[in-house]
Amino acid sequence: MEGFLRFLVAKAILLALASSFVSCYDPSPLQDFCVAVDDASGVFVNGKFCKDPKYVKAEDFFTSGLNIAGNTINRVGSNVTNVNVDKIPGLNTLGVSLVRIDFAPGGQNPPHTHPRATEILVVVEGTLLVGFVTSNQDNNRLFSKVLYPGDVFVFPIGMIHFQVNVGRTNAVAFAGLGSQNPGTITIADAVFGSKPSIMPEILAKAFQLDVNVVKYLEARFSSNYDRHY
């Protein structure tokens, strides 16, 4: 029961905090709602067509399952469960989404960015080392902190950031993002697993690596195995 109450409190806090992001990046809505629908006869707004309001139901604003732990048996030892406009059509134009992140001991949400959203994260279970790196203009400074249950950390929009479980038990965090569809670019996957591949000579010079090391990394990532989202 205590764990369930912590889950409810964390979810309520995130929704309250994330609501402040609604107008920070996505365009503000000009109607009560615009429930997304795959219908070419609908009205095109913010990347999604709008369902006719008279056909909107409560289910358009609902999803379930965030109480269920994600499968962390993968190469990075973590799992991200997304609740965005693809899961809740009613999020369309509302500028907010939510994720649950599960970590095995030693697992990580590897360095990545959200090009369209600021992220605010709260730890529910376990111990996480989190951080983000600033832009070139700020000399790529690292801001990092160890978080415990109840701790909250913000990752500014577009900054490369990460989370790592530094505890001996599983860890769980929830994060609110200031976009209905924040997008995710995992740095290693994008650089070494792009389709088609970036020329190894380019990456070898950029990362100051032997070209054969780059070819090895590209072979590992381009296989598209166990991609992390």
Curated annotation (Swiss-Prot):
GO cellular component: apoplast
One of the Pfam families matching this protein, by short name: Cupin_1
Keywords annotated in UniProt: Apoplast, Disulfide bond, Glycoprotein, Manganese, Metal-binding, Secreted, Signal
Subcellular location as annotated: Secreted, Extracellular space, Apoplast
This protein's record includes keyword Glycoprotein: yes
Transmembrane segments: none
PROSITE patterns the UniProt entry points to: GERMIN
Protein name, as recorded: Germin-like protein subfamily 1 member 7
Organism phylogeny: Eukaryota, Viridiplantae, Streptophyta, Embryophyta, Tracheophyta
